[in-house]
Amino acid sequence: MELRRGGVGNQAAGRRMDGDCRDGGCGSKDAGSEDYENLPTSASVSTHMTAGAMAGILEHSIMYPVDSVKTRMQSLNPDPKARYTSIYGALKRIMHTEGFWRPLRGLNVMMMGAGPAHAMYFACYENMKRTLNDVFSHQGNSHLANGVAGSMATLLHDAVMNPAEVVKQRLQMYNSQHQSAFSCIRTVWRTEGLGAFYRSYTTQLTMNIPFQSIHFITYEFLQEQVNPRRDYNPQSHIISGGLAGALAAAATTPLDVCKTLLNTQENMALSLANVSGRLSGMANAFRTVYQLNGLAGYFKGIQARVIYQMPSTAISWSVYEFFKYILTKRQLENRTLY
């Protein structure tokens, strides 16, 4: 979202440019809203990148244990000891049988990828959104512009994030042969080559482009309903972000299952499907999932995915908007001083 002064039309009806306040109307505004309205209508690229990096790191750090469970639930042929019926039960069993810190294995590599990936993502999204809104709609927000901007930003995000996804998902699997991110990177590099880190890239894009399109279009629509003036409103960001993330997650679960299979290359599942060597390509992944589990296989882990994405997107939006607000306000204050 862009920093706005009370809505698409900048100066909203409740605020007069000449400072005239009738019936005590100006006094009813809280200081935070007034401060936000006085900020510039757009933030700098460095602000978008810093706020985006913080949002990505905090989002993935907080939700990482649930992400670990989701990865295991999407396994096509899990070990009998790694069959779970609920997220809580899975986390409890993993910590009891594999160690308290086991659900966090791979968090370090995820944080290293999430920071720069989200920094580029939000910076690209904000600038593309502003440019495309001028092209598609001169009166305000265009849902088409938001969807296209999110899709374009996804290309940059996934280029950085895909190698981190490959490593962290292999570390998350039950009985993983890798004990650390470094050993996983070294083994994959030596045995499968550089291409292994991008084997699921096309599937990742095929999943994330519709995911982000649904996410941003839904988010902007909900913002119009719960926050029509587009003020800085953390509660509206949390609600809109959470619901948009849940809907997008449910709709794209089949693609996420295929991505997980391409990333993890489950040996037992591939042998049951008579796949020799390494599985590659989205079409092959779709065919293998159906061969092993039928239509139900495409929705393995949907509960964990929705439960993961709903708070994740809520955290991401609220943290991003908070840091963007703080950083832009500080830049404005420094500019005023000098």
Curated annotation (Swiss-Prot):
GO terms in the biological process aspect are: iron import into the mitochondrion; positive regulation of hemoglobin biosynthetic process
Cell compartments where the protein resides: Mitochondrion inner membrane
Q: Name one GO cellular component term.
A: mitochondrial inner membrane
Tissue localization of expression is: Highly expressed in hematopoietic organs, fetal liver, bone marrow and spleen.
Give the Solcar repeat ranges.
Answer: 43-131, 141-225, 232-326
Q: Coiled-coil segments, which residues?
A: none
Disordered: annotated span: 1-37
Q: Which domain of life is it from?
A: Eukaryota
A molecular function annotated in GO for this UniProt entry is: iron ion transmembrane transporter activity
Any one Pfam family match given in the protein's UniProt record, by short name: Mito_carr
- PANTHER family named in the record: MITOFERRIN-1 (PTHR45758:SF4), MITOFERRIN-1-RELATED (PTHR45758)
Q: How does it assemble?
A: Interacts with ACB10; this interaction stabilizes SLC25A37 and enhances the function of SLC25A37 to import mitochondrial iron during erythroid differentiation.
Q: What does the function comment of this entry state?
A: Mitochondrial iron transporter that specifically mediates iron uptake in developing erythroid cells, thereby playing an essential role in heme biosynthesis.
What name goes with this protein?
Mitoferrin-1
Organism of this sequence: Mus musculus
Instruction: Name the encoding gene, please.
Output: Slc25a37
